[in-house]
Amino acid sequence: MVKIGEINRTSTFAWSLDALPLLATGTVAGAVDINFTSSATLEIWEIFSPTKKNEPIFTASVEHKFYALAWSKPFENRPKGLIAGAFEDGTVEFWDADVLIKSKNLKKASVHKSTKHSGGAVKSLQFNPIQHHVLVTGGSNGQIFVWDTKTFGEPFSPGQAMTPMDEISCVAWNNSVSHILASTGNSGYTSIWDLKSKKEVLHLSYTGATGKANFSHVAWHPTKSTKLVTASDSESCPVILTWDLRNSNAPEKVMEGHKKGVLSLDWCKQDPELLISSGKDNATILWNPIEGKKLGEYPTTANWAFKTRFAPSAPDIFATASFDGKIIVQTIQDTSPPVSTKVSASHDDNEFWSELSVTETQQPVFEVKQAPIWLKNPVSVSFGFGSKLVVVGKDANGKSTLKVTKFLVKGHERAENLLKHLKSENYDAIVDYHLQGPAINEQDKSDWEVLKSLSKNGKQGLFDDEEDGSDTTEEKKNSANKEDADADATTKDKDIENGKDGKDDTANAANDGDGDDDFFAHLGNGSTRQTVETYSPSGDFDIYNSQTSKSDKKLTKLILKNKIDDAVDSCLEQDNLLEALVLALDSSAQVKEKVKNAYFSKHKESSLARVIYNATEKNVTDLVAHANVKNWKDIALGISAFATDSEEYSSKISELGDRILHHDKSARDEAITCYIAGGALDKIANLWLQELPQYEADLLKTDDKNISSPSEARLQALTSFVEKIETFKYYAKLGSVLSGPLVEPISKTILEFVNLISGAGEFELANKLLMLLPGDIAGVEKERISKATGKDTKPIVSEGSAARASVSSSKYSKIPRKSLTSANANANANANVNSNASSTGALPTPATNILPPLANHHIQGQTPSFVQPQPQTAFGQLPTPSTSSAYPTAPVAKSNPYAKPNPYTPNNIYKTSPVPQPSVAPQASFSGTAPPPPPAVQKANSKERMERLARNI
């Protein structure tokens, strides 16, 4: 309990229905004021204001005291509702609350005053919760009247009571049916009235073991029209009864807890499981009327607590009025600290008693802990991994239920179709989907067009020049074969050496233009090449004539002397390159190289000479590195013609793509074409990755109903990204695992997509995509999916670890185990120890420290070798490994440069180490014949051992 406010008035009260409600109070009739005054006032309090709660915002004197106050909900022309007061003289007066607060004028705010009740006081009144302008009043002589506050016409009576009542103590409207009301009085009965039939329809009474209940108050269930609760103010039977009118012979629950009569009840409108009561025992008690349990009791007052009410719009707050001159406003929850913490532990007795006298020592006592409905979770929901939705709630009987369902996110069809196409390897359907649908942007459309060309024509078809058309069918066939294997590339090299490049054939075909099928049938086999007649000298000639220069005479003489090398040098001196080239045809390779260099040096500014140089060298490094990238297709054709194998082709064509992109960022389509031809998946994917944000922005601009938020656009963009990668991998016949220096950001993006689709329950597709990633990157996600699917999980082994394990397994499978015994192993080990000890005079180190390492056994098929003795070290130190070892070492497996180091990975078990592996028995050499053991060392006495130790130190 937290006390919010305290009003020092002996007054009845009524809450407004504002979010932060106001409190109207009126001096209560039938009680003496604390100041022994007979005056009466009507006041309004802003109880939740930190500055105004101690003083009323409106106060006015009235002629008579009140028995009851009521505050209606707003209705027509009444923005803050009406305040109705029941006076002790039988008068009922109505005030406009809005005018009353603004004008502070009681007479101006009064809208009606009636003395319809004759012969006594009006004890109770209440506004209808459904028809807010309708009021019911009850008073002396059993009079009950229903008022229409819109017209203030003549009020009417609901009918004749079955049992006459002398006084009506409480009237209450049904919260669900507007024409039903209940009344109770001093006759001991509660009557149920139907205004439509204008009669009393039910009559309730109760007699318990201790006597008959004298009903003082009645309240309806907040939502169920057939249930209500009554209170008895009888000293002999102070009970609270819950009723179901469908069986009105006996109450459903009898709640006992008050020691004296109950004067007031209020059933919480927001929570049917909360009911508050107060009575003659000065107690205020909180109940659960559904279960008939007492929840707790609040601090008692000094006199009767004659009225208690929840704040209608703030049910966590309630007010209690008592005859001790106070109205206490407090919370139903107890959040106050214990009394012991409120009073300081002072050693001064006077200070202790002074603090104790002003401290609230009473605190509520709760027997049952129950959260109010506005703090309960009637239903809880949680998303689970794998597109699971867990819902916890209650069924119609109030029992807890647990439901696990699967929900589908927008765009799930794309993921399902992707899985279907991956299974069936129907990548053409993926390409057609993107080409036939609306283009997101030009870059995306261009990418899918290139992939379409790759699927139809292969890599070589990416560089076909429509204007040139110089490639022959045989050349395309050779290029396609070279993409598959190095053996095919070798065959193509032979064709190139034999002159089967097809260019002359195509030119010839263009000249002929006859369309003869026989021409195409023999295309590329040399049958259509132009022939040159064989030169045969004829006629007489002069070796020298009058015009022959000295240099020509010198050259002629050198040729006639068969000094061809000198003749070539002479030609080069005279800059006669043509003659030098002819002479070099039948000369040594050295001479040919000299003439070539002279030619290229002379014509180094010629583009044709540069191309000829690359062709004669059969090396396109210069072409790729320095040729103008504007002619990138011609460069690509040169790479295709002169690359020696598929690895060189991929490397050079990817390098060309790098140059294109570096030269002009806008030429990304040309660069991607080169990357696709070179199988540079990491570079292509990195470009696509950089363009993802723009692709997402373009997606949000489309009219796609599946894309209405950035997160949905992100999912679709990632789906397209993965589709491109999978399609390219399939058409380019690449390996299953991504590799390359740019694999880390690509892997992270694929992992993001895997996380999204696995969260949507697409575990099969997620597993397929995880196969793209290196084991060190995908390991955690694989284990997560395995656990979600209930499959047995196995330790994730990286490729490097797997390679080392394979080498180790192959070694041990080839060791001749029959030749190994523990006896000769120990003998060899001891022999090495004793030999070293004898030669140096040092004490022998333990045998276990010089055993050969696990990886240094002899492998079958290698040259046998003996174990070399380990170098001697100082006493107590482990020997260091020698730089040259006779033991074979396993190749170091490639590791992922982007993977985080794992200190627990056994990646050093094959390194030469003097420390033996704990799981292996003492080792010996398994290659050749073991050397004979040296003579045994005689035992030295203690004196000799001490001298030897001193020398070593």
Swiss-Prot record:
Residues 463-472 have a biased composition (Acidic residues). It is a peripheral membrane protein. InterPro entries: SEC31-like, WD40/YVTN_repeat-like_dom_sf, WD40_repeat_CS, WD40_repeat_dom_sf, WD40_rpt. Its main location: membrane. GO terms for biological process: COPII-coated vesicle cargo loading; endoplasmic reticulum organization; protein transport. The keyword Membrane applies. WD repeats lie at residues 6-46, 61-105, 117-157, 163-203, 210-253, 257-297, 300-340, 382-405. Disulfide bonds: none annotated. PROSITE patterns: WD_REPEATS_1, WD_REPEATS_2, WD_REPEATS_REGION. Component of the coat protein complex II (COPII) which promotes the formation of transport vesicles from the endoplasmic reticulum (ER). The coat has two main functions, the physical deformation of the endoplasmic reticulum membrane into vesicles and the selection of cargo molecules. Belongs to the WD repeat SEC31 family. The COPII coat is composed of at least 5 proteins: the SEC23/24 complex, the SEC13/31 complex, and the protein SAR1. SEC13 and SEC31 make a 2:2 tetramer that forms the edge element of the COPII outer coat. The tetramer self-assembles in multiple copies to form the complete polyhedral cage. Interacts (via WD 8) with SEC13. This is Protein transport protein SEC31.
